[in-house]
């Protein structure tokens, strides 16, 4: 719905994708990768694919808070990407 404040708007609601490739060759690396996944889940992310987690956010401001949290969780090694899309864009994915 597009309308007054408080109404659901598919352009205001956001989805965050966290995609990552972390090294898991040594035991400490595996532990850091597992802890990163656990911390994502503690912050409300759910597994979409093995290294892709998603989370719904009620607004862009809420998404910004969760993006900052993820940034603080990122291990020193590996690659982590965050993609923010509107609910409308999320609904249009194939």
List where the protein language model places each region.
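Basic nucleic-acid-binding interfaces
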Residues: 2-17, 22-94
């Amino acid at each position: 719905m597009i309308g007054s404040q408080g109404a659901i708007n598919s352009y205001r609601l956001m989805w965050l994708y966290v995609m990552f490739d972390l090294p898991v060759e040594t035991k400490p690396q595996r532990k850091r990768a597992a802890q990163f996944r656990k911390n994502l889940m503690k912050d409300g992310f759910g597994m979409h694919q093995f290294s892709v987690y998603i989370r719904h956010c009620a607004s862009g401001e809420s998404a910004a808070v969760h993006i900052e949290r993820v940034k603080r969780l990122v291990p020193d090694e590996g690659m982590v990407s965050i993609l923010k899309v509107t609910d409308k864009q999320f609904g249009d994915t194939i």
